């Protein structure tokens, strides 16, 4: 058993003001840019201040004898989480999804710095509650949420909390063969395939499902099941439009075999952190063995 004190890893992403200053250099230039688009710098600055205040409160909540770290979302793929880490995501619900794919059982506490803007599905706690949450952490209920796995035939694997996307890197037409666990098989030309979890059922998959009269019923967030959708399948003499949606329950999988170059797999909107397929490579998509452990 490790004798190390727990380490709290605060995870955040750059605010809109941070992005504006990185692009335009000064507050005056950022204000001018926003005015040209009918927006006000004060509103952007207020959101930035709320996020900074939440991060300050979260940092002060860490017990003095615990270790701590602060990580930007852009650096997640280069950071090594330790088994004793406690992850505190300060930001939007999507930030929890972004960090989940890099974890292996570490508890996650979602802190909502802007409840007037963020629904709080995954970032459930106000900043001033964090001190008590960390103190009582061993006895708090943890909700396990299903994740989706995409495994290439060369051993590479990618996880997602909301969904994974398979398709062309530019989102143009991709050619591939889709195979299901029951032996069904069809060649496709489409703008990609989205496979989502119960957590992701309110996001991208929901947008697609609303356009389908025969959309499969979405799973619950903790249910070991996924739904999948083919986007804009194109009928031709060589490609079909019959296998365009379905559910994967338990150990069922979906296999996608590339029939071209430039095909990729990424999860939860993080396109730079992706798997790349060459012609003939296969990716198998199914319920992941890992789960997100979300502190309630």
Residue positions per predicted region:
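Catalytic phosphate-donor-binding core of small-molecule kinases
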Residues: 2-6, 14, 19, 39, ...
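A solvent-exposed, charged loop/short amphipathic helix patch at secondary-structure junctions
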Residues: 22-45
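Short Gly/Thr/Asp-enriched flexible loops that form oxyanion-binding sites at enzyme active sites
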Residues: 95-104, 205-209
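N-terminal glycine-rich "phosphate-gripper" loop used for MgATP/nucleotide binding
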Residues: 89-93
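A short, basic/flexible loop-to-alpha-helix module at the beginning of a structural domain
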Residues: 73-81
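Short, acidic/small-residue loops that bind anionic groups at enzyme active sites
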Residues: 102-124
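Structural motif
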Residues: 85-86
């Amino acid at each position: 058993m490790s004798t190390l004190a727990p380490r709290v890893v605060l995870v955040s992403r750059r605010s809109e003001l941070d992005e504006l200053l990185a692009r335009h250099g000064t507050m005056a230039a950022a204000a001018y840019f926003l005015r040209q688009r009918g927006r006000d710098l004060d509103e952007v600055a207020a959101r930035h201040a709320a996020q900074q205040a939440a991060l300050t409160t979260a940092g002060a909540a860490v017990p003095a004898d615990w270790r701590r770290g602060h990580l930007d979302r852009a650096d997640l793929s280069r950071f090594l989480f330790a088994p004793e880490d406690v992850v505190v995501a300060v930001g939007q619900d999507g930030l929890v999804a972004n960090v989940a794919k890099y974890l292996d059982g570490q508890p996650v506490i979602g802190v909502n710095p802007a409840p007037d803007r963020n629904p709080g599905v995954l970032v459930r706690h106000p900043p001033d509650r964090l001190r008590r949450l960390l103190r009582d952490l061993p006895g708090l209920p943890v909700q396990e949420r299903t994740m989706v796995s995409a495994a290439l035939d060369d051993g590479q694997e990618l996880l997602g909390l909301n969904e994974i996307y398979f398709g062309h890197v530019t989102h143009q037409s991709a050619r591939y063969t889709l195979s299901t666990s029951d032996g069904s098989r069809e060649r496709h030309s489409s703008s990609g395939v989205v496979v989502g979890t119960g957590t992701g059922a309110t996001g991208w998959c929901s947008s697609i499902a609303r356009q389908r009269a025969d959309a499969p019923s979405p799973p619950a967030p903790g249910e070991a099941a996924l739904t999948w959708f083919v986007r804009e399948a194109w009928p031709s003499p060589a490609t079909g439009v019959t296998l365009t949606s379905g559910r994967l329950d338990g150990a069922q999988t979906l296999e996608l075999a590339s029939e071209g170059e430039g095909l990729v797999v990424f999860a939860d909107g993080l396109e730079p952190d992706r798997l790349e397929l060459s012609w003939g490579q296969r990716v198998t998509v199914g319920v992941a063995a890992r789960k997100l452990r979300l502190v309630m």
